[in-house]
Amino acid sequence: HLEMSGQMLSVVLRYGVDAEGAFHLNRSLVFPMLRMKPNKTQSNLKQRFDVSIPALITVEDKSLTDEKVSDITFDGMLKVESSFSYISGRSQVNDGIKMTRQLYPSALSPFYCEEYALENTKEKPVTIRIPEWKIVYSTPDSAGVYGAYSVEALLSKKGTFVLKPGEKLEFYALFSGRKINESPYLSANIGAEKGARKKLLEQWSNSLVLSTPDPVLNSMFAFAKIRGAESIYKTKGGLMH
């Protein structure tokens, strides 16, 4: 697993590739500033999401099948590239959809982003349907230091889309947490969020660089540096590790 953080949340991703080559993901969201009773160090709001976003999507009215992961990279953001097959009529179209996922936390806000890009790699148009999808968990008013909390997940797009050969369909999933009397996070400027995360990663990468003859040691230090720098939260008493 790996953990990533912004100033208002952390996300723990338990992920892997099964024997058939499919990607699996389980997310645990932690909101350090949404305090639970009794108000001790680890008494923060936590919520796990074990849901497959690709399983919600249909291509030609049927579920995507036979995922094959081709590449996984992590540089402070997790990127997964894979292909899916689908059924068209009575025939299976192998590797007809290429999917790219990018996963990262917001730098400043209490939400976590998952970007999805679907590309039609075949020579015929395909019809893709994305459902209206939203999940809301609420806590009792008596359980939180600041009252009731809400943890929510939603998709940025819904509807039916026809992809011509080579075209892409892009959308994102947003996972957020808030006090019940605050406005919900219904959308995000996803380009700005990714840009802010990249800017931080570049700053950390260019500072306090360890250079030794051992590239593995250098990489281990670089990842440890990211983790140490990002896990600083914006508390009511100021920034705190």
Predicted features, each with a name:
Residues 1-219:
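Terminal accessory carbohydrate-recognition/targeting modules of carbohydrate-active enzymes
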Residues 211-241:
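Extended glycan-interaction surfaces of carbohydrate-active proteins
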